[in-house]
Amino acid sequence: MKSTSEFRRITLTLACIIAVLAGAAALSAPLLLPRLFFLRQDSLVLAGLLGLLFGAGGRPAFAWSRRLPAVRLDYRTVAAGAGAAALLLWAGTYLLFDNYPLTRDEHMVVFDLAVFRSGRLAAPLPPEWRAYAAALTPDFLFHLPGNAAWVSSYMPVNAMLRTLFGMIADPALMNPVLAAAGAVATFDCARRLFPKSGGAQAVALLMYATSAQVLALAMTNYAMTGHLALNMIWLSLYLRGTRASHAGAIGIGFLAIGLHQIVFHPLFALPFIDHLRRQGQWRTAAVYCGCYALFGLFWISYPHLVALSAGLQTQTGMSGGGGFITNRVLPLLLHRDHRTVQLMVVNLLRFVTWENLALLPLLALSFGAIRRDESIARPLAYGILLTILAMAFLLPYQGHGWGYRYLHGLIGNCALLAAWGWRDHCDRDEVRGFVRTASLATLFGSIPFLMWQAAAFVRPYAQADRTIGRINANMVVINADYSDFRVDQVRNLPDLTNRPIRLASYWLTPADIRMLCSRGTIAFADPGPMDLHDLGVDRVPSSNKFDALRAAAPVQCLRR
């Protein structure tokens, strides 16, 4: 960079782009979660980021931070810091989030863990409950013949790893440990890419460790922490470039593809495999492609294995590539979301908000390395772009999530590209001053604010869950009409040993209620106690259908 004015021009350009997108998001963000999160969380942090960007390049604004000492890191220091951070995140899982699985995605990890802990791939569902499978677990179930058994529709590796980890420690510690492993792997990648630049190594680790998204998701059981950790371990092995390390990376790839959703890891890995081809390493690239094709076929056929393990015949079109395309891919391709542009604007702004506030300018400064095709700079950038495009096309609405979780596995890419930007431009005082000031603002401003907001959002749902759990009845019907969020309170163990057993109202009829009353007592969760969190919409009244279900319950089985 030749002058201060160039960095000033970059930051002003970024500030103008963010201001325009933020204005568009404020006017057009879809209702419920996207609008709620943008207005209550992201917009306030974006305002702070805009202040930093507009002030960048001004010597008085950042001069004080240039006197901060340089940091030199080694593996021992990083590993010790990562271990300490893992313990703090483990504590935060309980202190901030009550170790409560807020979303259906998170609950299904708990559900699958209980299934796998019993030594099965799918738990048998008693015959008398099979007609009520959808009411017992409304979303994300494999559709096994006759509902004879059940397990989530997600790939199993995340829950399997959690099951194995739970044999030796608290399962809630697994994601903090994975986040710590990802940090060490990110530092290892930076050491290999920038062996002569301790500052670049420190910046890569800084971008990772001060990501509010990394911290928040590590305190949940979302699979995204695993995606990030496995991706960075994969890249660390890939960069070693030996036969053994490539074999290790391929093994990690098998786990990463089956972790949660098949699509995420291949989008990360494909640019690096193509990089091997462009470097003339055709055989190695071919081995990766062949192995990944086999892994894809294996995981696509996983429903067939689940059915066979339960002694069931798979339904036509359920297993294999044809079933995967018919049941998983085509619905996403055929049912397009007309709000794609608005959602992706909100998603990307949310991602920027939940990262270190210095990340975006550093990514802009890495463009020179990307343009020069230096080392793996292009594959790092291509992985980010591929994932954004794929998610915009396939699934622009993420629902719940701290930050933009569909980009979570690429945070390591962003951190390494930011390190490139630092290495190329750290000789400029204004760059050093901006990064240090923005990092301090992140550490003492945006991270505490976002953690407070996330904890405040989760707490009422955890309280509602405990309230429902204390209802003195064998079963409770939860009014899930008109709301995508009340239905998340319908959560049961796979062996149905929890009391009360919870059922979603919109899958039941008055005849079902009369039948269920022959098995025990029933209570009804009214909408009033469920409306514990304002989602930016009017309160949802009790529906006629829900009232009809309650009226159908014989007096002798009804509990209030």
Describe the residue ranges of each PLM region.
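Hydrophobic, aromatic-rich transmembrane alpha-helices
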Residues: 60, 179-187, 270-278, 341-381, ...
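Signature aromatic-anchored transmembrane alpha helix within multi-pass, membrane-resident enzymes
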Residues: 72-84, 246, 251-252, 288-294, ...
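Transmembrane-helix signature of polytopic, membrane-embedded enzymes
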Residues: 80-83, 186-212, 228-229, 242-244, ...
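Hydrophobic/aromatic-rich transmembrane helices and adjacent perimembrane loops
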Residues: 109-110, 224, 378-382, 399-426
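Membrane-lumen/periplasm interface segments of multi-pass, membrane-embedded glycan/lipid transferases
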Residues: 132-144, 300-372, 393
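Membrane-interface alpha helices of multi-pass inner-membrane proteins
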Residues: 163, 189, 204-209, 232, ...
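Transmembrane-helix motifs of polytopic, lipid-linked glycan transferases
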Residues: 171-195, 232-233
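Perimembrane helix-loop-helix junctions
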Residues: 236-244, 264-293, 372
